Amino acid sequence: QYGAPGTEFKVYADGVYVSDKPMGPFTYQKHNPMSYKPGGFVQGAGHGGTFEDAYGNYWHVATCMLSLKYKFERRIGLYPTAFDKDGVMYSNTAFGDYPLLTPKGKVDDIANTFSGWMLLSYGKPVMASSMDSTLVPENVTDESMRTFWSARSGEPGEWLQISLEGLKEVRAIQLNYYEHRAVQHN
């Protein structure tokens, strides 16, 4: 595996070289990149590594672009990974922003790790007790990791409310915590 260049961009990737010998020569895998995520809440999926879990399933851990406090600021993404019938390694990053099912055994098809739970809050009405400058409540439902809401004070009693505009079955809640005004690391 290799981390492709492009850290300065919002989208970058990981690829694979293959060989029959540990010291090479190496050739470019038939399909690359093996990990790439150009859109959605999280973008990037590069400069990572792959591991095998206790059941024999493969997972790719990769960095995802944030770049708000510093140009190389990142978060970590986790994507199911497999090898096709020709031995070509690939990762499924399509629903990397959504909850995955934790395998309780060997997974035959990595698409089966997708929970099917879809985003209910996108673009829905939001109300809040207050806001800090331009960090409006609507940022909470815009499906961007790079925007966020902040209450004016951060004191007890601040709140945020999202209307799902009807009765919905909620299977999970995802909170993206951002270190707004954090000073412990300059």
Residue spans for each PLM region:
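Residue-level detector of Asp-centered blade-edge/turn motifs that repeat once per structural unit
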Residues: 52-55
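Disordered, acidic Ser/Thr/Pro-rich linker "stalks" and the adjacent N-terminal cap
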Residues: 101-167, 178-185
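Beta-propeller fold recognition
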Residues: 68-118, 123
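Short, solvent-exposed loop/turn segments at conserved positions within beta-propeller repeat blades
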Residues: 7-12, 71-74
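Blade-edge beta-strand/turn elements of extracellular beta-propeller
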Residues: 17-40, 86, 90-94
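Beta-propeller blade signature
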Residues: 13-22, 76-84
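Hydrophobic core segments of beta-strands in well-ordered, beta-rich domains
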Residues: 1-6, 57-66, 176
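Non-cytosolic beta-sandwich-type ligand-binding/adhesion modules
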Residues: 11-19, 168, 172, 176-186
